[in-house]
Amino acid sequence: MPDWKLQSSNEVMLLEAYGDSPAFDALLKATGRGARRDSPVDQDCIDAKNSVDNNDLEILHAPPGYAFFPSFFSLSRQFPTDGLTFISPCYMGLHNNVSTPEMKLRAHDWPPQTPDFVTHDVLATYIQDTAAAYDVLSNISFRTRVDKAEKKGSKWEVQSSRLVDGEIETAVQQFDALIVASGHYHAPNIPDYPNLPAWKSAFPSRITHSKVYRSPTPFAGKNVLVIGAGVSSTDICRELGSVAAKIWQSSRGGEYDLLPSMLPENCTRVGGIASFSTLTSTSLLHNTAPIPGSVILSSGEELKNIHHVILATGYHMSYPFLPHLHDDNATPEHANEEILVTTGQITHNLHKDIFYIPDPSLAFIGVPYHVATFSLFEFQAMCVAAILSGSSSLPGQQEMRKEYVERIAKKGVGRAFHSLKDDEGEIAYVREMVGIVNQGKKEGEKVEGHSKEWFEAYGRRLVRMKEKRGRKVEVEVKEKVAGPAEAVQNEGVK
């Protein structure tokens, strides 16, 4: 097994943030690195614009959250042609639903009296204050996009472009290792329903993905079809309930669908979608006019007088800066031993959902889901640091491959592959991370895993998840604490 110890030169850390905390903003100004305009829920901006020029340099190099308008969307599985039309899946009413005690970083405490469930700006402030406290800012390149990354010889060659005073500056840099921490929620899943592309083409602002949803205000008095019945869909339906005239929520009866009892009174749970009808007109619609077509359900029922369709159909894996490791023509079952992405359901060929088996100098943070994100990703980062610094080591490639193949045989190559939702799944995974970090460490130097406070909060999470999905509660905890109603969204996903 090669030694993947990093040299001191060219070490880099990139962070992605969603709005500046006071401490972070102060550092930006003090270092002259410029302010960022990336609030994902700037309502004034939402109300002022209905379309954006995708070729505008400010948009092409904007952080996630700045560019989020429905006109950006293409109804294909591919990224937009500019490659950088990033849209942040964050809306005004978003709360965490995995509690703050579970997400607490070992490196930084939450402010005193922080509730278990908070708004997204509190979460952003916590991450940014952590970065400010540890001088992460000096290692961040803002308004920069990675265009391509490729291993050449013993180094990773990274091509990037940066917007400076309205002009694009390009750069090519070499690194000993590449760590990808770009997350799950950027490449929307678009279902292949007959005539859906025609509806989107004719009325682009009426057919959107949940990723661009920001607030219920634009849907006041309208009839809305929300496709999908998972956590994001249910959260959106609950918000729409106070303003929309009529809501339908389409469900295929999936494993992660929430209970219909959680929906507002003006929302009806219906079955899966069979097709979208042929449009009777493609003329410009008045704001109050419904779409001139209908949606046919699998049962044969027909939904009419629909003003808006929201596709709450999730996301798929995509790493557009690693095109040589994508094979969009292959099925997951036929992925070879080098490819990372096929249909986007999973990221292939990773050891422990982190290390690229053919070349562990490529590592990923944040691939597992149904977890307490911040804390689990911190354990992953500690594991990566231990391997790349040489203080710990990985098994040989043959052993890593054997473990990966056995895992596929057990879990399959569907979306459940990266899920740690099963009882003890997340706990066992963190134990593995800690085991790797502690290789060769003496007593007194070893890193500990989850804290007592984490386990108590985790027990409460299991209760909430099983109650919301109508399952028998098998886990007993002394204290049962439920989050606010808003905390239902994305339960166990983020």
Labelled PLM ranges:
Residues 2-129, 153, 351-354, 400-425, ...:
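Glycine-rich active-site loop/strand segments that organize a redox cofactor
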Residues 4, 24-27, 41-56, 66, ...:
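Acidic, polar low-complexity intrinsically disordered regions
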Residues 349, 361-494:
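C-terminal, flexible cofactor-proximal segment of oxidoreductases
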